[in-house]
């Protein structure tokens, strides 16, 4: 039986694994995808303490996973489908097995929202991407359209522009929602232009995406942009959704986010939550790490005192 079962290998889950395994708790992480979670999709973490300019989110995630493993934390590459509380025993079920432990930390993070426009599902990975770090190199000499106006959209537009792509930010409002310094950098970049008050309505193409149907909500004009001689890429950044569907009916949720106390524990005794799935005001890598630390230390204290 595990002392702590951590669902999710992003910054919250990995920090918890580091603290728990270093405290000699029998710790396991369930992470079917890349270590680091959404952090791994970020090219630069300029506001993360100690991060160097050359540090990518992926590199930091890999180092955190290696650090957790060095203290003895195990990783199971399976998707968790349910969590059950049977008194003092917690049961985590994956697509292929069932695992028991004393405590659970849910740190499943969030996933990019989809716009839901015609052609979006068809052309994912065929011209449409949600990860500039992953796919930007394919379009370094291309024409790229970034959909969105928040921090993620503007940060990734800057990354793509610095690769050499000609970037057009398509934003439905007349100003960015991104932080001011990011907006100013984007507006000053020679490779970036902006279509204000413009919405993506459809993605066109056959085998690959080769056109966009756009709508200007100020002029009521609908128009089409077609691929030229250069590669065409579409990067969509319109928010994220907490990955908590498997917790419905188990934990108290608010719009999909988990309510926790000062020790990161949910309304169910022994089940904790940390990171982007927590009901809170700010979602940053740094506070995800802090929440993972708090949860792990709370579990370690309970094990010492009561188990």
Each predicted region: which residue ranges?
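Phosphate-coordination loops involved in phosphoryl transfer and adenosine-cofactor binding
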Residues: 1-3, 77, 140-142, 197, ...
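Beta1-alpha1 glycine-rich phosphate/pyrophosphate-binding loop at the start
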Residues: 2-71, 154-179
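Conserved phosphate-binding and hydrolysis motifs of nucleotide-dependent enzymes
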Residues: 8-13, 109, 148-150, 275
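A Rossmann-like FAD-binding core segment of flavoenzymes
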Residues: 68-93, 98-100, 162-262, 301-307
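Glycine/small-residue-rich loop that forms an oxyanion/phosphate-binding "nest" at active or ligand-binding sites
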Residues: 75-138
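FAD-site-proximal beta/loop scaffold in flavoenzymes
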Residues: 116, 122-140, 236-287, 291, ...
């Amino acid at each position: 039986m595990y002392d702590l079962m951590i669902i999710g290998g992003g910054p919250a889950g990995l920090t918890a694994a580091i603290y728990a395994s270093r405290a000699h708790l029998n710790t396991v992480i369930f992470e079917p995808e890349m270590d680091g979670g959404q952090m791994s999709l970020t090219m630069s973490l300029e506001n993360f303490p100690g991060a160097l300019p050359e540090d990518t989110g992926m590199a930091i995630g890999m180092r955190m996973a290696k650090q957790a493993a060095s203290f003895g934390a195990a990783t199971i590459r399976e998707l968790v489908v349910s969590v059950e509380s049977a008194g003092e025993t917690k049961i985590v079920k994956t697509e292929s097995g069932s695992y028991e432990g004393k405590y659970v930390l849910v740190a499943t993070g969030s996933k990019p929202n989809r716009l839901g426009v015609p052609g979006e599902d068809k052309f994912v990975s065929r011209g449409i991407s949600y990860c500039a770090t992953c796919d930007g190199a394919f379009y370094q000499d291309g024409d790229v359209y970034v959909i969105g106006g928040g921090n993620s959209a503007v940060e990734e537009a800057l990354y793509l522009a610095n690769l050499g792509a000609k970037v057009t930010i398509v934003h439905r409002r007349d100003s960015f929602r991104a932080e001011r310094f990011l907006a100013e950098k984007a507006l000053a970049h020679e490779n970036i232009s902006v279509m204000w008050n413009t919405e993506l309505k459809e993605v066109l193409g056959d085998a690959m995406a080769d056109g966009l149907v756009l709508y200007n909500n100020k002029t009521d004009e609908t128009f089409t942009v077609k691929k030229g001689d250069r590669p065409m890429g579409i990067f969509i950044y319109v928010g994220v959704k907490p990955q908590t569907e498997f917790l419905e009916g188990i934990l108290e949720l608010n719009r999909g986010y988990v309510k926790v106390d000062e020790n990161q524990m949910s309304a169910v005794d022994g089940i904790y939550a940390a990171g982007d799935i927590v009901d809170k005001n700010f979602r940053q890598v740094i506070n995800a790490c802090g929440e993972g630390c708090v949860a792990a230390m709370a579990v370690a204290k309970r094990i010492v005192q009561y188990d």
